[in-house]
Amino acid sequence: MCLAEKDLTWEDKFIDLATNEHLTPEYLKINPNGVVPTLVHENRLVHDSSVICEYLDDVFPDTPLSPKDPHARAEMRAWMRFHEEVPTIAVRTPSFNMAFLPRFQGLDEQ
């Protein structure tokens, strides 16, 4: 979303979580934690959505997404952290169960 808001061009690489593509040796080379997203910019890697957004604001300052006022910027960061820590975690277990539990039903304990 930040790339689009800054009117930047980019190349998407879809990572299929359902097939564990994020756990392949190829993907783990660019993100050892096996999570998405990862930004590759000028052969450098940037992980984590919020960090990527702040990085893009630093590298491409012509269309700023962050407020200039330090207090407003702190509030923005607080909301970004809230988004990462509260709703993301709250939906992780139900989302995992809906997406992956059917694959495991009927399997024996081996």
Regions found by a protein language model. Give the residues of each.
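GST-like domain detector, emphasizing the conserved glutathione-binding G-site
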Residues: 1-110
